[in-house]
Regions:
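Flavin-dependent oxidoreductase catalytic cores
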Residues: 1-204
Length: 204
């Protein structure tokens, strides 16, 4: 394994198996641990299930117990959409850490919020303004890397996530899914009653 020739940590992420009838997570995790993996992340759904079923956190608890004696940390993943979800996963599974996936789309603040909840028992949710501003930062950086047209196409779905929970967001998201230029995104916020935010001296 890479650990034999590199000082960099190597982590492995697995699902519970290909189908419910053929779970393979125990064998996969054991092989990873024996090969020198520094940590194993488990998403307790089968490949065939996709996101159709709820994540089986019981598998996370089982894997954590199995690898505890081997000194290999276990990261849990699946159905973690809020700081409260993350805390509950840690408490109920004994996992060493939580890996966010879809829960972080449109809400990069979830990492800070979760840390605050775990450290203090409370957290300050990010405002709608902060989330939209973060969305524009991501859009602009993506445009710098991939070009404006490609970035705007890619950000349509992401921006819908950023605007989730915003008053009037349903109508706003219709405008966002048709955006082809950064100016279209700004115009969507100008034309929608959902938000009136200032970004870089301009009104969205």
């Amino acid at each position: 394994m890479v650990t034999a020739v590199s000082p960099l940590p190597v982590t492995v992420k697995i699902r519970s198996g290909w189908t419910a009838e053929s779970p393979s997570w125990k064998e996969a995790a054991r092989a990873a641990a024996e090969a020198g993996a520094n940590a194993v992340t488990i998403h307790p759904r089968t490949r065939a299930a996709g996101y159709g079923d709820s994540a089986d956190w019981g598998i996370i608890a089982e894997l954590t117990a199995c690898l505890k004696g081997k000194g290999v940390p276990v990261f849990g993943s699946g159905d973690v959409f809020s700081p409260e979800d993350a805390r509950r996963m840690l408490e109920t599974t004994g996992a060493d850490a939580v890996m966010f996936a879809r829960g972080a789309l449109g809400n990069p603040f979830i990492f800070r919020e979760t840390r605050e909840l775990l450290e203090t028992g409370a957290y300050a949710p990010a405002s709608s303004e902060a989330r939209i501003e973060a969305g524009f930062r991501e859009l602009e950086r993506l445009a710098a890397d991939e070009g404006e047209e490609a970035a705007c196409r890619k950000m349509r779905k992401r921006f819908c996530a950023y605007s989730k929970g915003v008053a009037g967001g349903a109508e706003l998201r219709k405008l966002l899914t048709a955006a082809e230029r950064i100016a279209d995104y700004r115009r969507a916020f100008q034309d929608s009653a959902a938000a009136c935010l200032t970004h870089g001296g301009h009104i969205f």
